[in-house]
Amino acid sequence: MNLFVCGSIKIKDKEWIFSKIEECIAENNFTDVTILEGEARGVDFIAKEWAVSHGVPVKEYPPNVQFNHRDACHKRNEDMTKDCDFALMLWNGKSYGTFDDIQLCEKYSKPYKIYYYDLPENMQKNFTLTLEKFKSKLADGPREMLDDVWEEAMKICESN
């Protein structure tokens, strides 16, 4: 079971990240897990730390330095998405990189779960509703679509 763990480089709450990895594995009854991680600060490095501390294999995907940074990260994330059986997104709702991962999961029909970090519960619900609304466009949409998702989620907040 290849579990792609990804999220914002700004999320550094080790206890929260560890708990979400464990929750995801338990909820889905995953066995023989290998963590796929992209060697980025934040969630990636902490997911690797969790794996090592639990004796779980890690497959590392460093960005290819032949490309510019943004393209290298996208290519690396695309490779991890293609190779995963499930993706765990630990997202603050702002990271374009994690949004890119959501889009890639939609593009390649990969199952995923999003846990929101440091967002009020009503915004988490609104994001979930908005992502569902945009689902058919996510796979082919530009990463700037995140701005539309935010705008729509805020409209839902204002109407409640």
Locate predicted features.
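Residues that mark the start of a beta-strand
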Residues: 1-4, 34
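Acidic/glycine-enriched connector segments
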Residues: 11-124
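N-terminal acidic leader/helix
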Residues: 129-138
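Charged, low-complexity interaction regions
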Residues: 138-146
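Short, charge-rich amphipathic interface segments used for partner binding and complex assembly
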Residues: 145-160
